[in-house]
Amino acid sequence: MLINNRPQVILNHQFRYLSKSIVYWVCVLFSPIVVAQGDVKQLREPFRLMQLEVPAGERISGKLSVNGGADGVDTFIPVTVFHGRDSGPVLSLIAGIHGSEYSPIISMQRLPELLDPQAMAGTLIIVHIANLPAFQGRSIYFGPDDLKNLNRSFPGKADGTVTERIAFTLTEEIMPLSDYLIDIHSGDGNESLRPSYSAYYAEAGGAEVVDQSRRLAVAFGLETIVQFAGSYSSLDDAIYTSAQSVTRGIPSIDVESGELGVIDDVFIDPITDGALSVLRELGMIEGEPIVAANPLVISDRARVYSEYEGIWHKDALVKTGDFVTKGTELGVITDYFGKELQTVVAPASGVLLILFATPPVNVDDNIAVIGAVPPSISSLDRVQ
């Protein structure tokens, strides 16, 4: 009996040994651990954004569905998520809030090729084009389907028009996951805009949010920083992307670089470089941020609005980025037969930040924006 059972005992022992060996090697090969410099580290959990699930150390691109509404307009938001191998903050970069602001969109095409999720800490969400209907429709300011400005539509509505539903998706799906947020713009298809600048709310969101937003604005590395005034008593009042974000307690900045629908590296590279600099500042990639040594800070802006519909004739001697004095002629508006209706002059001395550069003009269009600063360079307010 014993003799007859011995081969079976040996066989059972060998089977158990083989089974343990298989289990061991399966665990070694497929368990979520990394061994680095003698340390064993548990990989962190995957990052989830709507239907996307991104394992640590990987990059995934996908389309975030914008729920359909009564208008019958369907759309999506193209995103790329880098979920770094190591823990860290979540930074969201949003391009294409306005469909004809191309510099941010092209920059967000280039940035992913410069990053390796295996060498990153934290998580980066790139919104390639927030407002796809406006991009596809080649429209400025407004969505072609509902004629609404996405950057005046936050926090959005789940059952609203397509622009309101895009705002709602960004508010409900992107913002709650974000520790920091950057809304990247350029001058629209009709606007000349120079110099490139970063901007933050200097009064909204509380002291810590203001301080961290200022940190982002400086880390972006541009030579000019604009301080937005004002705060918001409710989320419904915070109709701008970054205003909604800071009112929710998320440090945020705007960036402006580019103009007139032009694709030019002189505008695109500062966005890409600035994003990398912020990633370094937040410890998400290796290296030190590259910041401006003494950036100009603009704390007050003066705006000029058109009083008439007609044709805008920009003064040929005036260029954005130049210093203008109060009373400088910026251009004239004529009717469709050439009769002069309005001479537009600078309402304050300062840097001409934005100026219409194409002929169409409507009543109450914001033709020009001036960053009000004293004429003497020695008296300009600068970051210390």
Task: List the predicted regions and their residue ranges.
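Sec-dependent signal peptide recognition
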Residues: 19-28
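Structured catalytic-domain cores with a bias toward divalent-metal coordination
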Residues: 2-6, 13-15, 36-384
